[in-house]
Amino acid sequence: MPDPMRSYLDFEKPVAELDSKVDELRAMAAAGTDIGEEVSRIEEKAGQALADLYANLTPWQKTMVARHPQRPHFTDFVNGLITEFTPLAGDRKFGEDAALLGGFGRFRGEPICVMGQEKGATTESRLKHNFGMARPEGYRKAVRLMEMAERFGIPVLSLVDSAGAYPGIGAEERGQAEAIARSTDACLSLGVPNVAIITGEGMSGGAIALTTANRVLMLEHAIYSVISPEAASSILWRDGTKAQEAANSMKITAQDMLRFGVVDTILKEPVGGAHRDPAAMIAATGEAIAQAFDELKGLDADAIRKQRRQKFIDIGRKLS
């Protein structure tokens, strides 16, 4: 059987079958049968099938990969990259929102403010973090963090992975749109360098609120859009079953975003997606973060703001 701890996506069925065959052969080898060469041959075939599959993913397949439950989340990146992390809670206005986490720590010895959506990895944690869909309190907490970071001259890192801001009645009554707008404005107005990374889903204003940064990075199989494919399908076709068609038409992939100038860099994922080797993905992300902040060293507050604003003004003007 394939690795019981690994969740295969629908389009990965050929790879799952090969992995299952490898496991069967290994069991036979463990029982004393000399089939080492056959195991190696099937393993090589499975690896090549996986590489070929992921080299030609459709936008809808990338959407499925971006949502993979075993993909590294905010807490994984923080645990792997940030030392002495001290989380802050609450927006000082209404309460705490566990969907958007943030605090201060050190990245390679230097102070850093880090924040982002946490989807959760288990049923219990997903409910606790509301599947990464932040309420107004989360975005106001983000503003609070950014204000503190600017006060102390600390750079800001955002890790974005959300299906969007929470659309519940309570959230709307407490000013969801205003909170998103203020968070977006706070990002644009920062006098310290900020770097944003879209690690999975970057949907709607809930993502934009944290990604108006000097440098925007995106994982190879992440997606970024003003709306989810399912919602676009319901609006455009009045049919929620056309999500795959919508995704293939919306230009939501990292490659699309790079061509449009929306993101600056694509971070290559391990073969088979970040969920197959989270440790390698986190390490590569750390290198990219270090390079992005290094490129912004030496800029004063005015230059930082000017570069950031011009970056967003220029989006879409030059298509490669």
UniProtKB/Swiss-Prot annotation:
One of its GO terms (biological process) is malonyl-CoA biosynthetic process. The lineage of its organism: Bacteria, Pseudomonadati, Pseudomonadota, Alphaproteobacteria, Hyphomicrobiales. It catalyses: N(6)-carboxybiotinyl-L-lysyl-[protein] + acetyl-CoA = N(6)-biotinyl-L-lysyl-[protein] + malonyl-CoA. Keywords: ATP-binding, Cytoplasm, Fatty acid biosynthesis, Fatty acid metabolism, Lipid biosynthesis, Lipid metabolism, Nucleotide-binding, Transferase. Component of the acetyl coenzyme A carboxylase (ACC) complex. First, biotin carboxylase catalyzes the carboxylation of biotin on its carrier protein (BCCP) and then the CO(2) group is transferred by the carboxyltransferase to acetyl-CoA to form malonyl-CoA. Its main location: cytoplasm. It is found in: Cytoplasm. Belongs to the AccA family. This is Acetyl-coenzyme A carboxylase carboxyl transferase subunit alpha. Residues 41-295 form the CoA carboxyltransferase C-terminal domain. Its EC number is 2.1.3.15. Pathway: Lipid metabolism; malonyl-CoA biosynthesis; malonyl-CoA from acetyl-CoA: step 1/1. Signal peptide: none annotated. It comes from the Bacteria. It comes from Bradyrhizobium sp. (strain BTAi1 / ATCC BAA-1182). It holds the Pfam family ACCA. GO terms for molecular function: acetyl-CoA carboxylase activity; ATP binding; carboxyl- or carbamoyltransferase activity. Acetyl-CoA carboxylase is a heterohexamer composed of biotin carboxyl carrier protein (AccB), biotin carboxylase (AccC) and two subunits each of ACCase subunit alpha (AccA) and ACCase subunit beta (AccD). GO terms for cellular component: acetyl-CoA carboxylase complex. InterPro entries: Acetyl_CoA_COase_a_su, ClpP/crotonase-like_dom_sf, COA_CT_C.
